[in-house]
Amino acid sequence: MAGNAYSDEVLGTTNWLKEKSNQEVFSFVFKTEDVQLNGKDIGWNNYKKELQEDELKSLQRGAETTWDQSEDMEWESTVDEMTKKQVFIYDSLVKKCLFEVLSTKNIAPADVTWFVQHEWGKDQGWHCHVLIGGKDFSQAQGKWWRRQLNVYWSRWLVTACNVQLTPAERIKLREIAEDSEWVTLLTYKHKQTKKDYTKCVLFGNMIAYYFLTKKKISTSPPRDGGYFLSSDSGWKTNFLKEGERHLVSKLYTDDMRPETVETTVTTAQETKRGRIQTKKEVSIKTTLKELVHKRVTSPEDWMMMQPDSYIEMMAQPGGENLLKNTLEICTLTLARTKTAFDLILEKAETSKLTNFSLPDTRTCKIFAFHGWNYVKVCHAICCVLNRQGGKRNTVLFHGPASTGKSIIAQAIAQAVGNVGCYNAANVNFPFNDCTNKNLIWVEEAGNFGQQVNQFKAICSGQTIRIDQKGKGSKQIEPTPVIMTTNENITVVRIGCEERPEHTQPIRDRMLNIHLTHTLPGDFGLVDKNEWPMICAWLVKNGYQSTMASYCAKWGKVPDWSENWAEPKVPTPINSLGSARSPFTTPKSTPLSQNYAITPLASDLEDLALEPWSTPNTPVAGTAETQNTGEAGSKACQDGQLSPTWSEIEEDLRACFGAEPLKRDFSEPLNLD
């Protein structure tokens, strides 16, 4: 844009509006209405009484000057003098109202940005737009400003009314002006509360895009809509002619247009919301994201992991309900977006998988005590936790006491985190704690009795509605169940009567893990990191937590009578430089086999051993001899090197003893 192509007034106004482009201001409209009092008609042009105050006279002369300076000399205006005078009086009264409110707030006029424009509308007639704002203005003050301006506006209108009115009629006119809200404020209606709230506008944008684009009124009475005159706190638009105003609007629009148009994607939820979010809402949403990210599922976890946000919400009015509802949204989000298997797997430390030994875990040791294929059992459990078990949605650990049922179930529940517990003591609402959970834990289950149908629905992964204490019914989505018991839960008794028709349906819903081996007293608990590492090991080795993967690995889906011992797992050992694998063929030493090795004479000749020295090695069969033999074999295995002759001699002596060797070597060899 060439600097000499436009006048200084145009460029100055454009730059001034650009400086104020992001300033938020109130938007008011001053107006009048036709009133009839005792047969006396009062219209918009009946407020032309001579003003007595010096300040009002000065403001009126300023309006007259603005009109004269902003007229275009190329064409002659036909607006009559009475209409002009009425607009001048209105301009002085509007500014008088603004200055009086500023005075009550102790705000200096120099600290305020304002714009006034008198217009004529086809339907509304005369009205005056006012934009006002500053550093001492806030959105919450908008309605207070409207009430104060309405009071002053009605008072000064009564003073300027040139219709002969009695004192009672003047009071009535003022009441009508105040009650009818002859000063209005730009507001928006909240969709939820259905209340009106102040809507601030951007000062520069509103003037350039809306007010400066209008045409000037040139006829009397006005036939079309347009503006009479305008003024502002910076004395920028006061004396601009109509063409210059349109030019300022064009320059401002061109300068404020972004060079590159950024494409923004608005979600359906944002479009539906279509409102301004409060700081409280933003704070709650930020807190909720942090709670979900850190997997906070209980008030205790919140207190420990996010104490600042917990105290902040607790200190608010109704904080207890706010905490409860926020935590409920968090658990609902986890329950709908994650499975129990996902929550366990994300806790695994994958960097430790290299040295992780699956058979050394306490869970696999418990399964190995029963001769089971622990990889197969863990794979089946993970499929159920991943909601891939179909109708078989429950893992049942049952058997005598002290067989490891509860410690495995407890380790799985702790790894999941978002767990609901069945409360058998609460007869009427046993599932009160089981909504919005990733896992339901039933500890020491007994006779289901009257609740058997509800239990079967939950154990099969169906969506059902349950009653809650003090609340309405609530829906339980398909949720895996882990159950421990010492009893035969397939036998259902209602009163004194056994109901055998429930036995098979219950079995069809259970992954049956029957533990019978009593654990030693020093066995200990399952480590909290054990199940995350088990899940990560299964995924790494191709055991995906889906029923398709399970069938591909083990042949069929598990049933109630599943043989967990087949196929067998080879005895695992450590492979040098790698993790222990359950499918590595074990090496053996002579003592690990149940037979004796007798070397042939030709073999001894090939060995070319030196004559036997006095044997100091104990006779084979003693504990010391066995330990020595194992040590020699282990040294050979660990070294992975060719043995020396002395090591071979030492191993032979350790394995067979001195006397058996001499006797075998002295006997003649009979090849027949």
UniProtKB/Swiss-Prot annotation:
Residues 373-528 form the SF3 helicase domain. Its EC number is 3.1.21.-, 3.6.4.12. It is found in: Host nucleus. Residues 21-259 form the PV NS1-Nuc domain. One of its GO terms (cellular component) is host cell nucleus. It catalyses: ATP + H2O = ADP + phosphate + H(+). This is Initiator protein NS1. A motif (RCR-3) lies at residues 210-214. Residues 1-276 are annotated as: DNA-binding. The lineage of its organism: Viruses, Monodnaviria, Shotokuvirae, Cossaviricota, Quintoviricetes. GO terms for molecular function: ATP binding; ATP hydrolysis activity; DNA binding; endonuclease activity; helicase activity; metal ion binding. In the N-terminus, the endonuclease region is involved in binding to the origin of replication. In the middle, there are the ATPase and helicase activities. The C-terminus probably contains a transactivation domain. Its main location: host cell. It comes from the Viruses. Belongs to the parvoviruses initiator protein NS1 family. InterPro entries: Helicase_SF3_DNA-vir, P-loop_NTPase, Parvovirus_NS1_C, Parvovirus_NS1_helicase, Parvovirus_NS1_N, PV_NS1-NUC. It is an enzyme of class 3 (hydrolase). PROSITE patterns: PV_NS1_NUC, SF3_HELICASE_1. Residues 614-643 are annotated as: Disordered. Keywords: ATP-binding, Covalent protein-DNA linkage, DNA replication, DNA-binding, Endonuclease, G1/S host cell cycle checkpoint dysregulation by virus, Helicase, Host G2/M cell cycle arrest by virus, Host nucleus, Host-virus interaction, Hydrolase, Magnesium, Metal-binding, Modulation of host cell apoptosis by virus, Modulation of host cell cycle by virus, Nuclease, Nucleotide-binding, Transcription, Transcription regulation, Viral DNA replication, Viral genome packaging, Viral release from host cell. Residues 543-672 are annotated as: Transactivation. Residues 614-630 have a biased composition (Polar residues). Residues 191-195 are annotated as: Ori-binding. Phosphorylated.
